[in-house]
Amino acid sequence: ILNVAVEGALWRLRGTDGKAPSMIGWWPAKAVTFVDNHDTGSTQHMWPFPSDRVMQGYAYILTHPRTPCIFYDHFFDWGPKEEIDRLVSVRTRHGIHNESKLQIIEADADLYLAEIDGKVIVKLGPRYDVGNLIPGGFEGAAHGNDYAVWEKI
């Protein structure tokens, strides 16, 4: 779902019940998430994540409840190691875990915005103006191509 969502269908990241879709919404404590792996992704070309949106994928999986996995090739070969490190640091600093509370604030074609444990807010998508959706008391922690993460100060 995530690999389709980042290509202009970010509304897919909110199910009809308001939670994250599929297993990640039903039972996040047991869900393991990844952007690509050696069987499906960039090396096999079976169903690769859009290469220009890989960091949006990591911004999502590393800030959301569940158990995220980082693909070796992305971390060591592709070059976004520092961006991934920043996102891992946010996750660690705020104690995000597989049972953290997720509140999806907005999910449209060009904007996904969610708050995790009341401590972290993540934005995906090309929409720059998020209006009043980011409450006071948050500051930027990480950002890149079509994603941003804020943390409570």
Curated annotation (Swiss-Prot):
Its EC number is 3.2.1.1. Binds 3 Ca(2+) ions per subunit. Keywords: Calcium, Carbohydrate metabolism, Germination, Glycosidase, Hydrolase. Its cofactor is Ca(2+). Substrate binds at residues 19, 25-27, 38, 44, 123, 150. The record marks 39 as: Transition state stabilizer. It catalyses: Endohydrolysis of (1->4)-alpha-D-glucosidic linkages in polysaccharides containing three or more (1->4)-alpha-linked D-glucose units. It comes from the Eukaryota. The keyword Hydrolase applies. Coiled coil: none annotated. GO terms for molecular function: alpha-amylase activity; calcium ion binding. InterPro entries: A-amylase_bs_C, Glyco_hydro_b, Glycoside_hydrolase_SF. Pfam families: Alpha-amyl_C2. Monomer. There are at least 4 types of alpha-amylase in barley. Type B isozyme mRNA is undetectable in unstimulated cells and increases a hundred-fold after stimulation with gibberellic acid. This is Alpha-amylase type B isozyme. It comes from Hordeum vulgare (Barley). The gene is AMY1.4.
